[in-house]
Amino acid sequence: MFEDPRERPRTLHELCESLNTTLQNLQVQCVYCKETLQWADVYNFAICDLRVVYRDRSPYAACKRCVIFYSKITEYRRYTCSVYGATLEALTKKSLCNLLIRCHRCQMPLGPEEKQRIVDEKRRFHEIAGQWKGLCTNCWRPRRQTETQV
């Protein structure tokens, strides 16, 4: 479909422009399970700003179920370390606002409010596969109470 690797669309929006279609009408398969993505999966992939991959010159994306599943596998296999926000800023010499940090569960890029929430809650950012990760608002779970009241 796309012969020249340099001219291949990298996002779903670019792919839609190349194919002269809309996200709603886009037919693309999941690179992992090979199922055709439902419209909700297409929108989720686009909102997460993930990149299209190519196999045999054909574009593939990933359904939400596979993104979550393979994110967990990557976390188990490629976890490096966890650091607090101030330490991360010192390590990278960049403000948290200027760092691309994705949710380690759904791969959504974190906004400034989500990054600040992680700092305020004294949670850590994680280095997984050479990228910094945290938790987005949708995947956030409150900490369990470890003490019981009598």
UniProtKB/Swiss-Prot annotation:
Chain span(s) of sequence motif PDZ-binding domain: 148-150
Keyword Disulfide bond attached: no
GO CC list: host cell cytoplasm; host cell nucleus
InterPro entries the UniProt entry points to: E6, E6_sf
Location of the protein in the cell: Host cytoplasm; Host nucleus
Annotated GO MF terms: DNA binding; PDZ domain binding; zinc ion binding
Alphabetical keyword list: Activator, DNA-binding, Early protein, Host cytoplasm, Host nucleus, Host-virus interaction, Inhibition of host innate immune response by virus, Inhibition of host IRF3 by virus, Inhibition of host RLR pathway by virus, Metal-binding, Modulation of host cell apoptosis by virus, Oncogene, Transcription, Transcription regulation, Viral immunoevasion, Zinc, Zinc-finger
Superkingdom, natural source: Viruses
Main location: host cell
Zinc finger (unnamed): 30-66, 103-139
GO biological processes: DNA-templated transcription; regulation of DNA-templated transcription; symbiont-mediated perturbation of host apoptosis; symbiont-mediated perturbation of host ubiquitin-like protein modification; symbiont-mediated suppression of host cytoplasmic pattern recognition receptor signaling pathway via inhibition of IRF3 activity; symbiont-mediated suppression of host type I interferon-mediated signaling pathway
Any one Pfam family match given in the protein's UniProt record, by short name: E6
Miscellaneous information on this protein: Belongs to the high risk human alphapapillomavirus family. The cancer-causing human papillomavirus E6 protein has a unique carboxy terminal PDZ domain containing substrate.
General function of this protein: Plays a major role in the induction and maintenance of cellular transformation. Acts mainly as an oncoprotein by stimulating the destruction of many host cell key regulatory proteins. E6 associates with host UBE3A/E6-AP ubiquitin-protein ligase, and inactivates tumor suppressors TP53 and TP73 by targeting them to the 26S proteasome for degradation. In turn, DNA damage and chromosomal instabilities increase and lead to cell proliferation and cancer development.
Quaternary organization: Forms homodimers. Interacts with ubiquitin-protein ligase UBE3A/E6-AP and thus forms a complex with human TP53. Interacts with human NFX1 and MAGI3. Interacts with human IRF3; this interaction inhibits the establishment of antiviral state. Interacts with human TYK2; this interaction inhibits JAK-STAT activation by interferon alpha. Interacts with host DLG1; this interaction leads to the proteasomal degradation of DLG1.
Family listed: Belongs to the papillomaviridae E6 protein family.
Protein name: Protein E6
Annotated organism of origin: Human papillomavirus type 26
